[in-house]
Amino acid sequence: MADNARAARMAKRIQQIVAVAIEREIKDPRLEYVTITDTRMTGDLHDASVFYTVRGASIDEEPDVPLAAAALESAKGQLRKIVGDQLSVRFTPTLSFVHDTVPEASAHMEKLLAEARAKDEAVRAQAAQAKPAGEANPYKERN
């Protein structure tokens, strides 16, 4: 069993190797908008999960995640060979690609927070103009 520090170092190195390989060595146009965001290794250093995001060609265009996933799946063997050539380890880890949903989740959270702020501001504006129901002093005074 490898220590966690070694697994973390190897994961970081695999992330760099895969990112550079996708950018420079793999000639698949479907991978043009793929970004490698994170890599995690198992404790035995035999499997690496590579997390990726996909962006659209423009800001308004939706990313084609299934197309990018298919491209990564077809390039998996070539990427593993590149990783094996550049890592000096006895066993080259198998690569599995996982779509990273953190950017979409954080964008959704930001949207929800913006809606909550807008509702808070509306309540604050309504409270500033509100007058108490009934008399100004709601408590009965004894004479």
From Swiss-Prot:
GO terms of biological process kind? maturation of SSU-rRNA
Classification via InterPro entries: KH_dom-like_a/b, RbfA, RbfA_dom_sf, Ribosome-bd_factorA_CS
Gene Ontology molecular function: ribosomal small subunit binding
GO-annotated cellular components: cytosol
Kindly state which keywords UniProt assigns to this record, in alphabetical order: Cytoplasm, Ribosome biogenesis
The lineage's top-level taxon is Bacteria
Q: SUPFAM superfamilies given for it? A: Ribosome-binding factor A, RbfA
Give the Pfam families listed for this entry.
Answer: RBFA (PF02033)
Q: Where is the composition biased (Low complexity)?
A: 124-136
Segments of this protein annotated with the region Disordered: 123-143
Write out the annotated subcellular location.
Cytoplasm
Mainly resides where?
cytoplasm
Biological function: One of several proteins that assist in the late maturation steps of the functional core of the 30S ribosomal subunit. Associates with free 30S ribosomal subunits (but not with 30S subunits that are part of 70S ribosomes or polysomes). Required for efficient processing of 16S rRNA. May interact with the 5'-terminal helix region of 16S rRNA.
Q: How does it assemble?
A: Monomer. Binds 30S ribosomal subunits, but not 50S ribosomal subunits or 70S ribosomes.
Which protein family is named in the record? Belongs to the RbfA family.
* HAMAP family noted in UniProt: RbfA
The UniProt entry, under NCBIfam families, shows: rbfA
Name the UniProt record assigns to this protein:
Ribosome-binding factor A
Organism of derivation: Corynebacterium urealyticum (strain ATCC 43042 / DSM 7109)
Gene coding for it: rbfA
